């Protein structure tokens, strides 16, 4: 009699969808107001001049201009600002 033994089960085979986080506009790039600059979890980057912070910590431009990355303060925090053109 032809028999096939039953296959075993597995506990793998799933993964979460990627969230597409990261820097979307780099230093020196021109942006329009409302443009997303960084998508992040927590505040890896902080909002500087003319930059807003969304409730998921997304940083976005509040004015047209050029993106500027800078490190400030005693804790060497990374700030992102928009310099008006």
From Swiss-Prot:
What's a BP term from Gene Ontology annotated to this protein?
translation
Keywords carried by this UniProt record: Ribonucleoprotein, Ribosomal protein
- Gene Ontology MF terms in the entry: structural constituent of ribosome
Pfam families in UniProt: Ribosomal_L27 (PF01016)
Can you tell which superkingdom this protein's organism belongs to?
A: Bacteria
Q: Where is this region: Disordered?
A: 1-21
GO CC, one annotated term: cytosolic large ribosomal subunit
What InterPro entries does this protein map onto? Ribosomal_bL27, Ribosomal_bL27_CS
Which family does the similarity line name? Belongs to the bacterial ribosomal protein bL27 family.
> Which HAMAP family does the UniProt record give?
Ribosomal_bL27 (MF_00539)
Q: Which NCBIfam families match?
A: L27 (TIGR00062)
Protein name per Swiss-Prot or TrEMBL: Large ribosomal subunit protein bL27
- Source organism of this protein record: Photorhabdus laumondii subsp. laumondii (strain DSM 15139 / CIP 105565 / TT01) (Photorhabdus luminescens subsp. laumondii)
Supply the source organism's classification. Bacteria, Pseudomonadati, Pseudomonadota, Gammaproteobacteria, Enterobacterales
């Amino acid at each position: 009699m032809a028999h096939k033994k039953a296959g075993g089960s597995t506990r793998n085979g799933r993964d979460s969808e990627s969230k597409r986080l990261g820097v979307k506009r780099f230093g020196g790039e021109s942006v329009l107001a409302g443009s997303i600059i960084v998508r992040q979890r927590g505040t890896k980057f902080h909002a500087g001049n003319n930059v807003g912070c969304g409730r998921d910590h997304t940083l976005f431009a509040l004015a047209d201009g050029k993106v500027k990355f800078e490190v400030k303060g005693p804790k060497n925090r990374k700030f992102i600002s928009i310099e008006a053109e």
